[in-house]
């Protein structure tokens, strides 16, 4: 790295930072996607049940009885919240990928030998 100009070293450090941010973002996105899939599946299953079905939900370390209508409402809210979160993460991922692409291009341009003309 001693032959690399300080400006390029700085860009390389920024590139590494972006890559780490992207990795964390992808992990968050996967977690939210998994939660969303689970919530949708639970909602799908609950909606198949009769209205008077006995339903239990976990609250912390407890399991409590709830009504079907309340469980459906809570799950729909959870799905909506997770979809909003997922969309936000996807937008962030897209922006970060664009920054990575731009910075990579800048670094490559900086490292190319000048063209004699």
From Swiss-Prot:
Q: Name one GO cellular component term.
A: cytoplasm
Q: Where in the cell is it found?
A: Cytoplasm
Entry superkingdom: Archaea
Keywords for this protein: Chaperone, Cytoplasm
Q: Name one Pfam family in it.
A: Prefoldin_2
Assembly:
Heterohexamer of two alpha and four beta subunits.
Regarding protein family, the annotation reads:
Belongs to the prefoldin subunit beta family.
NCBIfam families on file: gimC_beta
The protein's name = Prefoldin subunit beta
